[in-house]
Amino acid sequence: MAIKMRLARAGAKKKPFYQIVIADVRSRRDGRFIENVGTYDPNQNPAAVKFEEGKALEWLGKGAQPTDTVKQMLKTAGLWEKFTTKPA
């Protein structure tokens, strides 16, 4: 079972809001997901990105592959560096 960390759209028409979720690659964009690990609100200026750090790092450690957009968000939040640096 391949797992992705990706965006799931929520919110009203013309007012998008996204949840950052862990989902099976076979499920639809806004369909079934395993766990919610954060949010992204592009309506705020600047756009608000919030991660639950423990959950996000746990799923990355389990092998969840982030999409390109989520990977950039992880880098901006500083979580990608925490994941890629291995303790000595």
Swiss-Prot record:
Cited Gene3D superfamilies: 3.30.1320.10
GO cellular component annotations of the record: cytoplasm; small ribosomal subunit
InterPro entries, per the entry: Ribosomal_bS16 (IPR000307), Ribosomal_bS16_CS (IPR020592), Ribosomal_bS16_dom_sf (IPR023803)
Annotated GO biological process: translation
Alphabetically ordered keywords of this record: Ribonucleoprotein, Ribosomal protein
Pfam families reported for this sequence: Ribosomal_S16
GO MF terms held by the record: structural constituent of ribosome
Superkingdom of the source species: Bacteria
Family as reported in the entry's similarity comment: Belongs to the bacterial ribosomal protein bS16 family.
Alphabetized PANTHER family for the sequence: 30S RIBOSOMAL PROTEIN S16, SMALL RIBOSOMAL SUBUNIT PROTEIN BS16M
Name this polypeptide is given: Small ribosomal subunit protein bS16
Species in which this protein is naturally found: Geobacter metallireducens (strain ATCC 53774 / DSM 7210 / GS-15)
